[in-house]
A protein has these predicted regions:
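ASCE RecA-like P-loop NTPase motor cores
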Residues: 1-32, 42-327
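Intrinsically disordered, low-complexity repeat regions of secreted/extracellular protein precursors
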Residues: 35-39
């Protein structure tokens, strides 16, 4: 009611006033939804003194602590200048297991029609694969357009389109994974649980990492655009100001490294075991036309580069053939 709304507004104002004294190394942000407000305070930079005094052992491990040998993207903001770094090579042979294609004939990423055109192209690629495709978007708007377009285009192809937000993440991944498991698929068909031949999963930010789909379930990953950070995010803006104060370029020091890590995470959904094969399509020609594209390309595994759509379809045909003979 109105009284409760006024009370919440007063509480938010009080929190805002108290956070006005926070120093420039941190940022306070309040996010409001229909019934809840969430306030978070995040440090934009961490000096080594904040790690406390006395002997301590800190071990950080991840596939995406950085895209360079020094792992500066992770180490610098935490003040880990003296830390020992170790980079372990991937066990996967990406040059033979995966290929990359960047279409040059799509609308520019800033064009309002980009998502629609990309979705129509994807609908043609997934039919011979019988699904086995994940489309990762950089915005919820693109997610909605691509999901709707794919459902219309694939309505007669017996391919299910799974969409983030229509079920839990666990449920979506379980259903998608079931299509790649031939034994599970036959069993579920006999029980009337699976009616389609395959599936396409359309998802956004939360699926760019932490998704593990080894085997035949996933053989085509499509990233709609380069995952640049949202420019009006308060944390992004605060960090940019800190970098500018040091006389450095926020684009070079922050935007490109953040984008490289996100790109690496999204691409990492494709190959999850030594037996996997597949194609990564990035629907953003800036990767090959802009000067910074080379920097971002270095974040990707050493995959075979495909030049044309015909090359991509031929590669997919090889993936399908190998799957049918070994499945």
């Amino acid at each position: 009611d109105s009284a409760a709304a006024l009370q919440r507004a007063a509480q938010m104002a009080a929190r805002g006033a108290s956070s006005a004294g926070v120093d420039s190394a941190s940022i306070s942000k309040t996010e409001t939804e229909t019934e809840t407000e969430t306030e978070t305070e995040t440090e934009t930079d961490t000096d080594s003194e904040h790690k406390g005094s006395g002997p301590k052992a800190w071990i950080f491990t991840s596939a995406t602590l950085g895209d360079d040998a020094q792992l500066d993207w992770f180490a610098k903001p935490l003040g880990l200048d003296a830390a020992t770094r170790a980079v372990v090579s991937s066990p996967f042979d990406f040059s033979t297991q995966a290929a990359l294609w960047v279409p040059r004939d799509l609308p520019k990423p800033t064009d309002p029609g980009h998502a629609l055109v990309l979705a129509r192209r994807v609908s043609q690629w997934v039919v011979p694969l019988q699904g086995r495709t994940m489309v990762l978007t950089t915005s919820l708007r693109a997610l909605g357009i691509i999901a709707e377009t794919l459902r219309e285009a694939l309505s007669g192809q017996n391919i299910e389109v799974l969409v983030q937000g229509e079920s839990s993440k666990h449920a979506l991944l379980s259903r998608f994974r079931s299509y790649g498991d031939a034994v599970s698929q036959r069993q579920q068909r006999s029980e009337g649980e699976v009616t389609a031949n395959g599936a396409v999963l359309v998802a956004s930010v939360s699926f760019w990492e932490g998704v593990d789909l080894p085997g035949d379930a996933l053989q085509l990953v499509v990233l709609d655009k380069l995952p640049f950070p949202v420019p009006d995010d308060p944390l992004t803006q605060a960090r940019a100001r800190r970098i500018t104060e040091r006389g450095l370029s926020p684009f070079t020091e922050q935007v490109l490294p953040d984008t490289a890590i996100a790109l690496k995470q999204g691409a990492g959904r494709l190959i999850r075991s030594e037996r996997d094969r597949g194609v990564l399509v990035i629907g953003d020609q800036r990767l090959v036309t802009m000067g910074y594209g080379r920097r971002l390309m270095q974040a990707l595994p050493n995959m075979q580069r495909l030049e044309t759509e015909a090359d991509m379809l031929a590669y997919l045909h090889g993936v399908i053939t190998k799957t049918s003979t070994t499945g």
